[in-house]
Amino acid sequence: MPSFDVVNKIELQELDNAVNNVKKEIETRYDFRNTTTEIDLHKGDLRITVVAADEMKMRALEEMLHAHCVRRKIDPRCLEFKEIEATSRGAVKREVQVKEGIAKDVAQKIVKAIKDSKLKVQGAIQDQQVRVTGKKIDDLQDVIALLREGDFGIPLQFVNMKN
C-alpha cells in the first residue's frame, strides 16, 4: 500500500548558517557597535541564546533571525521565543527554542483532519511523525494538499513516499 510520512524536521546546518549570518550582520551594523550583543546556537538541545543591550535591539535581533531563517528556507514558525529576562550586566537575554518533530497533540489534530476529509486513507502516529497510508496515490496527494492548506502551528514536510 502506498504511504508517506508527515514530519517536522530542521536542517541543523542551515540553522547554524542563519545564526552565523546574523552574527556577521551584527558586526557590520552601526546600531550594534560597542554594545553587548550575542547570539549562540546550542546544537545539543536545539536552542538559541540571544543577548542584547536593550529590548529595542532584542526586537531587531529577532527580526534579523527571522529574515535569515527565511533566506535559508527555514520556516520561522519552528522558532519559539521565550520570555525576555534581565541579566546582571544590565542587558536583556532571551532563549529561543527550536521546535523539531510533531508533538502528540498536533499529531492528533493532523490525524483528525485526515479522518474528517472522508478520504480512504489512514493516519497513524509514530513517535514524532505521522504515517499516512492509502490504496491510491491520488488520495495521498489529496491529503498532502489538505495538510498544506491547514494551519497546525508548525511547518510540515512530506517525506518517504512509498508506492
UniProtKB/Swiss-Prot annotation:
Pfam families: DUF520 (PF04461)
A cellular-component GO term for this protein: cytosol
InterPro entries named among the record's database cross-references: DUF520, UPF0234-like_C, UPF0234_N, YajQ-like_sf
Molecular function, one GO term: nucleotide binding
Keywords: Nucleotide-binding
The keyword Nucleotide-binding belongs to this UniProt entry's keyword annotation: yes
Keyword Translocase found: no
Residue stretches in coiled coil: none
PANTHER family (UniProt xref): UPF0234 PROTEIN YAJQ (PTHR30476:SF0)
Functional summary from the UniProt entry: Nucleotide-binding protein.
Family: Belongs to the YajQ family.
UniProt-recorded name of the protein: Nucleotide-binding protein DVU_1981
